[in-house]
Amino acid sequence: MSKILVFGHQNPDSDAIGSSYAFAYLAREAYGLDTEVVALGEPNEETAFVLDYFGVAAPRVITSAKAEGAEQVILTDHNEFQQSVADIAEVEVYGVVDHHRVANFETASPLYMRLEPVGSASSIVYRMFKEHGVEVPKEIAGLMLSGLISDTLLLKSPTTHPTDKVIAPELAELAGVNLEEYGLAMLKAGTNLASKSAEELIDIDAKTFELNGNNVRVAQVNTVDIAEVLERQAEIEAAIEKAIADNGYSDFVLMITDIINSNSEILAIGSNMDKVEAAFNFVLENNHAFLAGAVSRKKQVVPQLTASFSA
């Protein structure tokens, strides 16, 4: 029997990689499964900081599960097929651990599925460690903590669940770090955008959502200076136009998120700008508009777009 591949979504972030490492370890220890962690893309700068800090090698990148000889896979931090490996429909999904909406997901066989509306997939995996009485190694605790910090912007995002505020200090202690100091350093590591091309910038953390027959790409970049990113607007818009043409997106929505002040600027291009404007009750000027208090794609952008595109 081949190894069960464990991986997060395309354009992996710290939670996608952290939760997959953690669950692969738990699956071996608690369930006796033969698992291997892989990824659907290279780590971003934030995640590279995390892996280096805790001395963990980056997972190898795959583009096909079947090409790896895999018959079964476990998904963490996602379930929608368009966000997963290209041939996901051709292998058996053994299990899913996720904290997002369920959409465009169907399996031929029963599976193990753990879904909770918490701040990160890592939060769920940590609870499973405790349920099974499995000791958490320091580096695994660090990866799960990093996934939680990343997805909740150090517990400031509205996606933060009350249990996340309990879990974070526990994981910080297990990882041997100061929660606030490490969290801020980690988040700042992911805001170095100057070295990124516009094409790289709009793909750092991007997901495609099928909204009422429209393929809508929603990307997010974190920064400490929104104005600095907007100085590159012409370059970014050219990259977005190319991405739309190359991939058949109907619309492209980019969140430029200020992690210090917890606000975002929305830059949007596509065929349904009236629906984007209606979603957030704003008017786009020169293709962008300010969205006060918005830091979460999952809670403050995608549900609003979903409702607007369905109206």
Curated annotation (Swiss-Prot):
Record keywords, A-Z: Cytoplasm, Hydrolase, Manganese, Metal-binding
Co-factor(s): Mn(2+)
Major location category of this protein: cytoplasm
Cofactor note: Binds 2 manganese ions per subunit.
Reaction equation(s) it catalyzes: diphosphate + H2O = 2 phosphate + H(+)
One Pfam family recorded for the sequence: DHH
Keyword Repeat: no
Class of this enzyme: hydrolase
Similarity comment: Belongs to the PPase class C family.
Name of the featured protein: Probable manganese-dependent inorganic pyrophosphatase
